[in-house]
Amino acid sequence: MKRLMLTLAFVAAAAGTPAFGQQSTGVRVEFQGPGGHSFGAYGRVSALHAAARTVILLQKALPAGSYQITNLTGGNSVNAIASDGIIELKLTARNAKAYDALVAAVTKAAADGAAEENAFRGVKPGDLTAGAPATVRSIVTRF
């Protein structure tokens, strides 16, 4: 019984240390845009280009070793401007507060990546393409 109590006391004390309190889960960043055929819709924003711009921003915003990009995908056809783009990451932080800071940095990078693609194509909030928003938008979710 004494040995069990000592073991439990050690585990309880160790659980408060960074090595045992690590936070590690996945984050999905989704981009949505109008898309279209590359001939008729030339010059429209690309959700996949926004995702690629975000990856570059993530490299600058997140500390080395705190993330892994596990998936980067988008588009649905040859000769088409991608209407969707997805980045999936695994984030690792020493505690919940640091993890929330990483998620906030990912959210900012996603918004900035979409804004860069919109600015590059000259699209402003409120612009429409065939009645739908002409901008690329981003959504960040934890999974």
Per-region residue spans from a language model:
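C-terminal segment of classical bacterial N-terminal signal peptides
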Residues: 14-19
